[in-house]
């Protein structure tokens, strides 16, 4: 099964907690604090793998979590950093942040990597908090929480040439004729429901990768049917072979088909519409006279400088000449580099610990937020040293000043989660 889009949840590892420990050795009565720092949590890293061709694996597993860092221990022993979690994705995968739709990375080359969530920093052990006036700190920091987010993976095929056209015009037959690809072929609409890749190997020509894109229908650029999913796969191609059914056996006009497909390409992306097109008038073996082809060719050439070939994928007529022109055109076009504008990029915000101050009906001032959770997790407010450190942090972070601005007075109660104290200026 070909899967070209997936949404997954990723969470990096939490940092390990710092240790509260005191040196206790024979003959060392005043050893002091010796708690070590916690280890860093594991990152989650996506890496492109040329051996993968689909995002099918992400249909079965959608949640990925890296390991937490190890906690610190006595004797200033640092906790071990967790190993990073590497997740393989196909080359050509675009990574987007799900909530914003912004691009995090475009993994177009072998072994391209991107860190999608960073592991949390390890907490500091109590040995770090010893000072001349605080010689036996009875608290340590917890590890920082890891990052988490949902990301979208979109696979855009890496092909030199894209075969485009309405359903049932013979694209799959052309691909099977010029390569070893074995796409499903039958005489009904939407036979191809997934892109197929093949390497065109024609004697005397440089090989190139060609993609059979499922048939585009009217309204594809607006998402009708599977239009947007199909169009995405030709964004990276350098040349388009526009396949037309010249026979008209299904009652469609070849010229009108040409105009309609180009309208869909233009609506989806002007750059895509402006890409070099070589026109392949297929199923010529079903046309008794050349007049139909010549009339079609004359109309198309009035629209622009198009190279037009009369071919039959069934009999092989004109195929080598068509591929020779494709090879010649490719030689003049550099490999497409995907440009990502800065405004389209997802740039993770620096993690900040915030708080807000509310006042309840009974007059109690409530301070809540991620800052409060982290602070209370890092100190033992039941110990004198911990309580003093707690107050210093509130003062340094501006919480005390903000409480005063909110109108707090001596004797008012302040609550941070489950911890309450009486305010004294």
Swiss-Prot record:
This protein's name: GTPase Obg
Gene behind the chain: obg
Location(s) in or outside the cell: Cytoplasm
Originating species: Clostridium tetani (strain Massachusetts / E88)
Cofactor annotation: Mg(2+)
Quaternary organization: Monomer.
GO annotation, cellular component aspect: cytoplasm
InterPro entries: G_OBG (IPR031167), GTP-bd (IPR006073), GTP-bd_Obg/CgtA (IPR014100), GTP-bd_prot_GTP1/OBG_C_sf (IPR036346), GTP1-OBG_CS (IPR006074), GTP1_OBG_dom (IPR006169), GTP1_OBG_dom_sf (IPR036726), OBG_GTPase (IPR045086)
GO molecular function: GTP binding; GTPase activity; magnesium ion binding
Positions bound to GTP: 165-172, 190-194, 212-215, 282-285, 312-314
């Amino acid at each position: 099964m070909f899967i070209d889009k997936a949404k997954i949840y990723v969470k990096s590892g939490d940092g390990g907690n710092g240790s509260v420990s005191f040196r206790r050795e024979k003959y060392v009565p005043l050893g002091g604090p010796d708690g070590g720092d916690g280890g860093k949590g594991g990152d989650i890293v996506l890496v492109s793998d040329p051996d993968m061709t689909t995002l099918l694996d992400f249909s079965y597993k959608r949640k990925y979590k890296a390991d937490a860092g190890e906690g610190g221990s006595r004797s200033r022993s640092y906790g071990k950093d967790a190993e990073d979690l590497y997740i393989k994705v196909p080359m050509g995968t675009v990574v987007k942040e799900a909530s914003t739709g912004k691009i995090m990375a475009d993994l177009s080359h072998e072994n391209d990597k991107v860190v999608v969530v960073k592991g949390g920093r390890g907490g500091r052990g109590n040995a770090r908090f010893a000072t001349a006036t605080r010689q036996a700190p009875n608290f340590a920091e917890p590890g920082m929480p890891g990052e988490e987010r949902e990301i979208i993976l979109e696979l855009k095929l890496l092909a030199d040439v894209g075969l485009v056209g309405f359903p049932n015009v013979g694209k799959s037959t052309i691909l099977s004729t010029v390569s070893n690809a074995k796409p499903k072929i039958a005489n009904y609409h939407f036979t191809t429901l997934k892109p197929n890749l093949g390497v065109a190997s024609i004697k005397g020509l440089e090989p190139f990768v060609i993609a059979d894109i499922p048939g585009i229908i009217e309204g594809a650029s607006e998402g009708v049917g599977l239009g947007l999913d199909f169009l995405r796969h030709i964004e990276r191609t350098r040349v388009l072979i526009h396949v037309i059914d010249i026979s008209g056996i299904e009652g469609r006009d070849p010229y009108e088909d040409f105009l309609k497909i180009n309208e869909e390409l233009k609506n989806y992306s002007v750059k895509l519409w402006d890409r070099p097109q070589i026109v392949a008038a297929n199923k010529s073996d079903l046309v008794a006279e050349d007049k139909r082809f010549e009339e079609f060719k004359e109309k198309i050439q009035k629209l622009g400088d198009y190279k037009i070939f009369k071919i039959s994928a069934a009999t092989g007529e004109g195929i080598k000449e068509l591929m020779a022109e494709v090879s010649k055109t490719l030689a003049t076009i550099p490999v497409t580099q995907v440009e990502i504008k800065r405004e389209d990029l997802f740039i993770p915000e620096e993690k900040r610990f915030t708080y807000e101050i509310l006042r309840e009906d009974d007059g109690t001032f409530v301070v809540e937020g991620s800052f409060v959770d982290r602070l209370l997790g890092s100190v033992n407010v039941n110990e004198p040293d911990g309580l003093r450190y707690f107050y210093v942090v509130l003062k340094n972070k501006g919480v005390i000043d903000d409480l005063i601005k909110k109108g707090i007075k001596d004797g008012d109660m302040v609550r941070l989660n489950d911890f309450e104290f009486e305010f004294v200026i």
